[in-house]
Regions:
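A short, charged, and often flexible helix/loop element on the N-terminal side
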Residues: 55-86
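Conserved donor-binding/catalytic core segment of Leloir-type glycosyltransferases
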Residues: 4, 206-222, 228-231, 244
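Glycosyltransferase donor-sugar binding loop
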Residues: 186, 242-250
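Carbohydrate-associated surface elements
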Residues: 42, 163, 185
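Short His-centered aromatic/hydrophobic patch
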Residues: 100-105, 124
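Nucleotide-sugar donor phosphate/pyrophosphate-binding loop at the beta->alpha transition
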Residues: 118-121, 129-149, 170, 196
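N-terminal subdomain of nucleotide-sugar transferases
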Residues: 1-46, 50-56
Length: 250
């Protein structure tokens, strides 16, 4: 299967978790025998094209007269993504499916779908309402509406938890059978052969104590506040538990 990945971030550009998800997913799909092409934003000195161990990666510039307007910047990026994808289709043939990652590439995905009759599969990594506990201004409303449009235009929608599945159904009225729960994968080979460093561990807890480790951005949507508020209850059952938080933000 020929798969087109549309994403606004791909290594070396890392804004959040989408970059790593698309990177790992693309390489895994390639190993399963699929042909994967990524079209993304070019940041800094990243090459406009590279063959990343079999994954074809195309990066587009996104010059803007008024770069301070994020929505305009995103719309210009979508225009450039469409132009690059159309160029690839003209030289290498049509893709079998478009995999769009979040609202940031929604209009590019929709345009390519309608222009070339290519189905969309979208992954919704988070929602604007979920990030902000509701919709409070016009920018958030625009993003929320774009998320709805992407899920409407998609043949299938992917989320990584049942919580997100319920959230999409509640926010956008999607039929349950259209939403597929596929948790983000973990490459366990990365942990093979790693020796435990007990001296490092002792910086945070004694040998007989349990460690609860949180790793992630320290922002509301990651839910670290719930873990912190739950600690008194956890300590009732596990008196020797320690919570270690690693991340940036706040």
């Amino acid at each position: 299967m020929k798969i087109l990945m549309l994403t606004w971030e791909y290594p070396p550009r890392v804004v959040g978790g989408i970059s790593r998800v698309v990177y790992d997913l693309s390489r895994t799909l390639l190993k399963d025998g699929h042909e994967v092409t990524v079209v993304t934003y070019k940041e800094g000195d990243a090459p406009e094209f590279e063959d990343d161990k079999g994954v074809k990666v195309y990066r587009v510039n996104n010059y803007m007269i008024n770069p301070n307007n994020f929505i305009d910047w995103i719309m210009q990026l979508n225009f450039n993504l469409v132009a690059k994808a159309s160029e690839i289709i003209a030289t290498e043939g049509k893709f079998d499916v478009i995999h769009a990652h979040d609202w940031l590439v929604a209009y590019a995905a929709k345009t390519l779908k309608n222009s070339y009759n290519i189905p969309i599969v979208s992954t919704i990594h988070a929602t604007e309402a979920g990030r902000n506990s509701g919709i409070h201004d016009e920018t958030q409303r625009y993003i929320n509406d774009t998320e709805w449009m992407l899920t409407y235009e998609s043949s299938e929608v992917i989320v990584n938890s049942n919580y997100m599945k319920n959230e999409l159904q509640r926010l956008f009225g999607l039929p349950y059978e259209k939403i597929n729960v596929i948790p983000n994968g973990v490459n366990m080979n990365l942990f093979n052969g790693i020796e435990r460093d007990y001296n490092f561990r002792r910086k945070f807890a004694m040998d007989n104590e349990k460690i609860i480790l949180f790793m992630g951005r320290l922002v509301y949507e990651k839910g670290i506040q719930y873990l912190i508020s739950a600690m008194p209850k956890i300590l009732e059952g596990y008196h020797d538990a320690k919570l270690v938080i690693c991340g940036k933000g706040g």
